C-alpha cells in the first residue's frame, strides 16, 4: 500500500464531490474540476473524508494509488483555496502587462511576446515585473507558468530571466581571460 495513497483526503464544508462511474467531479467556491479515475482505483467517503483504495494489488495499480490520491487532493484544494504562482522578471527592460485575454511580455526581443491566457487562470501584473497567477487546476497553472518562463529561462552568468518566487539562480564565474 502506498504511503501517500493510504492517507485520507479531508473534504471542506464548501466542496461537493460526485463520482459517477469513472468520472469524478469536484465543485467548490472557485470552480469545478473533472477527472477520469481508472477502474483499478476505488473511492469511498467516510466521515467527511475520502479514502482512495486499490482494487487488486498489482504493481501497476499500486503505482496509480498514490498518483490518483494526490490528483484528487489537488482538485479538492484547488476548488476550495486556489493555487497561486508568482513569477519575477529580472533584467533591464523586462516588462509584463495584461491586455484583455492575453499577457504581453517585453523580454529583450525585437518584438513583444503575446500569450493567450488559458481559461480558468487569472493573471495579475504588479509593478510591471511581477506576475501573479491563480487557478484551481494545479496542472494547467504550472503548464502556463512554465510556458511563460520558457521565453527567458534564468541564465547563470548575469542572473537575468523569468524566475519563480523564491528561486535562487546558481551563478557562474565568467571567462577568466588569457594568462
From Swiss-Prot:
GO MF entry, a single one: rRNA binding
* Keywords annotated in UniProt: Chloroplast, Plastid, Ribonucleoprotein, Ribosomal protein, RNA-binding, rRNA-binding
Among InterPro entries, the record links this protein to:
Ribosomal_uL6-like, Ribosomal_uL6-like_a/b-dom_sf, Ribosomal_uL6_a/b-dom, Ribosomal_uL6_bac-type, Ribosomal_uL6_CS
The keyword Plastid appears for this protein: yes
Task: Write out the annotated subcellular location.
Answer: Plastid, Chloroplast
Coiled coil regions, renumbered to chain:
none
Q: Name one GO biological process term.
A: translation
One GO cellular-component annotation of the UniProt record comes to: chloroplast
Per the record, the similarity remark reads: Belongs to the universal ribosomal protein uL6 family.
Q: How is the subunit organization of this protein annotated in UniProt?
A: Part of the 50S ribosomal subunit.
Q: What function is annotated for this protein?
A: Binds 23S rRNA.
Q: What is this protein called?
A: Large ribosomal subunit protein uL6c
Amino acid at each position: 500500500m502506498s504511503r501517500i495513497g493510504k492517507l485520507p483526503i479531508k473534504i471542506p464544508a464548501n466542496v461537493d464531490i460526485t463520482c459517477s462511474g469513472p468520472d469524478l467531479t469536484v465543485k467548490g467556491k472557485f470552480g469545478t474540476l473533472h477527472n477520469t479515475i481508472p477502474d483499478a482505483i476505488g473511492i469511498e467517503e467516510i466521515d467527511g473524508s475520502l479514502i482512495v483504495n486499490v482494487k487488486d494489488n498489482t504493481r501497476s495499480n499500486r503505482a496509480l494509488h498514490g498518483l490518483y490520491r494526490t490528483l484528487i487532493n489537488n482538485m479538492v484544494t484547488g476548488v476550495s483555496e486556489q493555487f497561486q504562482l508568482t513569477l519575477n522578471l529580472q533584467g533591464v527592460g523586462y516588462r509584463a502587462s495584461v491586455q484583455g485575454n492575453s499577457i504581453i511580455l517585453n523580454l529583450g526581443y525585437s518584438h513583444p511576446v503575446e500569450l493567450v491566457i488559458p481559461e480558468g487562470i487569472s493573471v495579475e501584473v504588479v509593478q510591471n515585473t511581477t506576475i501573479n497567477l491563480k487557478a484551481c487546476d494545479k496542472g494547467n497553472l504550472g503548464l502556463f507558468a512554465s510556458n511563460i518562463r520558457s521565453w527567458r529561462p534564468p541564465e547563470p552568468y548575469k542572473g537575468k530571466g523569468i524566475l519563480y518566487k523564491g528561486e535562487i539562480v546558481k551563478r557562474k564565474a565568467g571567462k577568466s581571460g588569457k594568462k
